């Protein structure tokens, strides 16, 4: 896993931005680890989720290493492991998306919105995916077709 998300810290290092401070807390530079794990906003999101992620246990960990450790520690034969990781990645994505709406649309910080969105997205995905493979509605036969011909 490479550190290639355009965080403000990376944009500052690249000379694209002058300011690397996290727009969520204005306290530390926005690295991926800060944005997803260490920022008080991210901590509130994880704390409010049902995923048992205790970000107070993290201090100098890179988010990439945390994910690798998490993936390696899971028993993939155990029921619910895939759903758990799906929820982890959905929460990460929702934090990123919320940060973007705060920065680009002036939206107010709302950890509850992140928590609820990250909980409902997997359900919405499953619903859409299951609807794609549900039986199609049978169409009626054209009037010029004999009754014994089926489609």
Question: Where in this protein do the model-derived segments appear?
Answer:
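Primary recognition of RNase H-like, Mg2+-dependent phosphodiesterase/nuclease domains
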Residues: 1-151
